[in-house]
Amino acid sequence: MSASTQVTERIPHRPPFLFIDEIVSETPDGLVARRTWRAEESFYQGHYPGAPITPGVLLCEAVFQAGALYLARAAADAPGGRGVPLLVKIGDARFRSPVYPGDTVTIEVKKRDLTAGFFAMSGTMKRGDTRILSVEFSVAWKAPEASP
């Protein structure tokens, strides 16, 4: 499964560094997305040969991209909504279970607070009922700079 147009129209990420396949649902305060980790992805060749596990940093990135999708919707409704998401803070990341090639995960992000243009968010990743990851993070939305 490749990323839906719904995803690629909102955020600038593209394969091979796009880790959201589809948006499942949205609310005013959050978003739920889905991702299937495909065995043919090149990072599995080195992490780890013969015993592939999805790198934790990529699991976090998938959560951050879900946060970017949420913010892109909010920015689209604001004046001058074009821009890119910038991750500004990561805190309290906890990994509880590994993710293997072929696993499909659900990612949920929720807005916790908005202060001075920074969105504080929480994110979780699950495989079925098994919690894989929880992380707190903050994102800013950067408008494009004028060209000289």
Model-derived regions: residue spans:
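Hydrophobic beta-strand-centered segment that forms part of the acyl-chain substrate-binding groove
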Residues: M1, A66-T106, I132-S134, V139
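RNA-interacting cores
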Residues: M1-A3, T8, P52, S147-P148
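Short aromatic-glycine motifs in intrinsically disordered, low-complexity regions
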Residues: S2-R14, G80-R82
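Beta-strand-rich interaction surfaces with strong enrichment in secreted/lumenal proteins
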Residues: T8, G50, F95-S97
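Catalytic strand-loop segment that frames the active site of acyl-thioester-processing enzymes
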Residues: P15-T54, L59
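A residue-level detector for short acidic-glycine micro-motifs
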Residues: E22-S25, D92, S97, K111-D113
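HotDog/MaoC-like acyl-thioester-processing domains
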Residues: P28-V32, V99-D103, E108-P148
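Short amphipathic alpha-helical face segments that pack within enzyme cores
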Residues: L58-A66
